[in-house]
Amino acid sequence: MESMGRQDRRLHQQLKESSSRFQTLMKRLIAKYNQPFEDDPLVEMRTLTYETPQGLRVWGGKLMKKEDKEYTQVIDRLNGQAPEGDSESSGADTSLEENWPSCSSAMREASGDPRQRQPAVPGNTLETDLRRKYLTQVDILPQDEEYFKNAEKRGGKDTVMTWVPSVTSSVTPASGCQDAISAKSSGGPEVSALSSRGQGPSYPCPADMAIVARSDGLSLLGTSSNSVSSQSFEVDDLCNVTISDLYEGMMHSMSRLLRSKPSCIISTKTYINQSWKLRRRPSRKQGLHKNRTHCPRSKPSQRSARKGPASCSEPGKEAGILRDYGNLLHVAPHKTGLELKSVSLEGSKRQVHKSSPAWKELQMMPQKDLDLNRERENRVMTLQWLISPVKVVPRPRMLPSQVEKWYREIKIKFDKLHQEYCLSSGKQPRLTDPTESWAVDVYRSGSKSPGSRQDVETCRPSSPFGREKTERPGEALEDLRGNGKSVKTKSCLLRSCPSPEGSPSRSPSHSQLSSGLQEHNSEPTGKAVWPSTAISAPSIGSPGCGKDNYYELKKEFNRLYQKYCLSPQRAKVTSCGRVSPMKAAAALPCQSEHLKRLNPDSPQQSSQKRSISPGCHRRVLQDSTAQTASTLVRDSWLPTKRCKLSYPVACAHQAKFHDTSGASGWP
C-alpha cells in the first residue's frame, strides 16, 4: 500500500510539473504573438474593437467615430478605465455601484449586506446593448462537456450561476447578469435571487468578475474537488488544467464568436459529425425510374423504428433486381439474347408490382436507404477495382440504334457490291433465288461460331433476313463416307463452270481454292470434287479413309469461311490470287460461252447445265472404272497449288485486273 501511495504521489508530482511547463510555454507564445502581423488589425477580445485609420471599429459592426464621446466612455469602461471626470472623485466601490448596479447588488446579497434590498438603478442602455451583441462567454471554457450538453438542453433558459472573483486579468466577463444569480457564502446557507426578467432591465458585469456553474464537484479548472466559492484559488490548482480540458469549450466559444462570418466558422467535433452525412446523389437516368415510390421524410424516431434488418433485406434485393432489369435497355439484343421492348418492359414491371407481395413493403421503405445501399455497393466495387492488379476495362456498349445503323450500313454496302458483281458478270441481281451466291447466304445466316454445325450449313439461312430453304453442303459432303454412292455436292459458292483440261482459261483463284482442299492429302482418291459440279464416281478406299477425307474437307471449308466471309474488311485486297472468280471468268472468252448457257431462273436446270465441258463429259461417260475416275479428278479437275509459268494467259489477265480495277476478295 505504501509503495502504491508513493507511486501515486510521484505521478501526481510529474503531472503538475508537466502542466506548469505547458502553461509557461503557452504564456510565452501568447506574449510573442499578441501583436498584429504586418498590417493585420489587433482586436481587443474584451471589447471586440480594433483601430482603423477612420477610427475605432467594432468587430463585425459599424464604425465608432472619435467625436462620439458616449462610445468612447463605453469602451473605456469596458477596458477597466474610469472616465476623466469620475476617476478622482469616485472610488472602486462607488464606480462599481454606478456602472454595475446589478452586479453590486448580487455581491451584497452574497455577503449579507443590508443594502441588498435597495432597488437597482437603471444603467446605460447603449452599454448593455453593446455587451449583449458583441461579447461572448469566454470564462466558461474550463467547464466540462456536461455543461455544454445542459446548455443545449436548456435552450437559453435561466441557469443558476455563482459569482467568483477573477483569477487573472485575461478572463473575460460574461454577457451580463440577465440570468438568475445565486450566491453561496463561506459559512452561510444558500440564497437565491429573483430572475432579472422580474427585476427590470439587465446589466452587464464588470471585467474583474467571472461566472462559473455552481457545483461542489467542479472547480474553475475542472479538477478540484472543493467548492469554487468557498476557497481561493492557489497556484497549484492552476497546474491541474490540460489542453484537452480547454479545447472543446474553446472551439465552441470561438465558433460563437466568429459566427457572423461564415468563412471563419471553426468546426467542432459535433459539427463535423453532423456535416459528414451521406448525401443523396441525383440519378443520371431520370427516365428509367419513373415507377419509384418516394416516401415523405419522417422523424428520426419513426425512421429508426421502421428500420428492420429482417424485413427490409428482401425488398431491397428485389428493388436492386428491378433497377438492374430496367438498366438493360441500352444493351444490344444480340448480346443478351433478350428482346427488350419499352412497352413490354413497362407491362412486365406492372405485373411484378402487382404479383409480388414484397412490393408493398418496398413502397413503405424510404428511398434514402435504397440509395445508401446502392452507393455502398458502388464504393465496394470501386475499391476492389483500385486494389486489383489487373485492370479490366469494360468495352463501351452500343445502343440498339447504333447496332441497327451498323447493320443497315453493312447491308447497303453488301447489296451494292452484289449488284456490281451481277452486272459485271451479265446477270440480273436476284436476292430471292435459292441458288444465289454462297456469300449472300453466309451474310444472311447470322453470326455463328466457326466450328459449329450451323457453320457448315451455310446455305440454310438462320436469321430474319432470308428464309429460303436450300440443301446443306454438309449433307452433300456426308455422301463421301459411303462406298458406291455418287458424290453429289451442291453448293452456292460459285456459278462458274471450269474449262476442259489444258484450257488456259481456268481462274487462278479456282486453282487456289481447289489446291487448298487437297493440300493435306495427296493420295489418288476422289476425295475432293469441285462443289459447283455434279459428277458420279465410285469412292475408292476404306470407310475410315472416307471419314478422314470428310473431316479434312470440313476443316478446309471452315478455314475458307473464316477467311473470306467473317472478315468483310478484306473485300479489297491487292493480292493476285484473290481476284473474284466471276470477274475473271467474265473477262475470258471461254468462260463467257459457258455463262450464256446458264439459266438463273430455274435452279434445277442451272444445276444440270453447270456441268463439265463436252470433252470432259464424254471422258467421264466412257471411263467407268475407279482408276479412270481418280485420274480424271487428279489430272483434269484439280490443278496445281500455285499459279506457275505454264499459265501465262491467266496470270496476265490477273495483272490486268489488278492494275485497272484493283483485286477484290469475295464479298
UniProtKB/Swiss-Prot annotation:
Subcellular location: Nucleus, Nucleolus; Chromosome, Centromere
Basic residues: compositionally biased ranges: 279-297
Coiled-coil intervals: none
Molecular function in Gene Ontology: DNA binding; histone binding
Transmembrane feature ranges: none
Modification Phosphoserine, positions: 169, 185, 195, 388, 424, 449, 462, 567, 613
Any one GO CC term of the record: kinetochore
A family per Pfam: HJURP_mid
InterPro entries hit by this protein: HJURP_C (IPR022102), HJURP_central_dom (IPR021052), Scm3/HJURP (IPR018465)
GO biological process: CENP-A containing chromatin assembly; chromosome segregation
Residue spans of biased composition, Polar residues class: 601-611
Biased composition (Low complexity): 496-515
Predominant location category: nucleus
Cross-link (Glycyl lysine isopeptide (Lys-Gly) (interchain with G-Cter in SUMO2)): 554
Biased composition annotated in UniProt, kind: Basic and acidic residues: 466-482
Keywords, comma-separated and alphabetical: Cell cycle, Centromere, Chaperone, Chromosome, DNA-binding, Isopeptide bond, Nucleus, Phosphoprotein, Ubl conjugation
Sequence segments annotated as region (Disordered): 78-126, 181-201, 279-317, 443-530, 596-617
Biological role: Centromeric protein that plays a central role in the incorporation and maintenance of histone H3-like variant CENPA at centromeres. Acts as a specific chaperone for CENPA and is required for the incorporation of newly synthesized CENPA molecules into nucleosomes at replicated centromeres. Prevents CENPA-H4 tetramerization and prevents premature DNA binding by the CENPA-H4 tetramer. Directly binds Holliday junctions.
Subunit structure: Interacts with CENPA (via CATD domain); the interaction is direct and specific for CENPA since it does not interact with H3.1- or H3.3-containing nucleosomes. Heterotrimer composed of HJURP, CENPA and histone H4, where HJURP interacts with the dimer formed by CENPA and histone H4 and prevents tetramerization of CENPA and H4. Identified in a centromere complex containing histones H2A, H2B and H4, and at least CENPA, CENPB, CENPC, CENPT, CENPN, HJURP, SUPT16H, SSRP1 and RSF1. Interacts with 14-3-3 family members in a phosphorylation-dependent manner. Interacts with MSH5 and NBN.
Designated name of the protein: Holliday junction recognition protein
Gene label: Hjurp
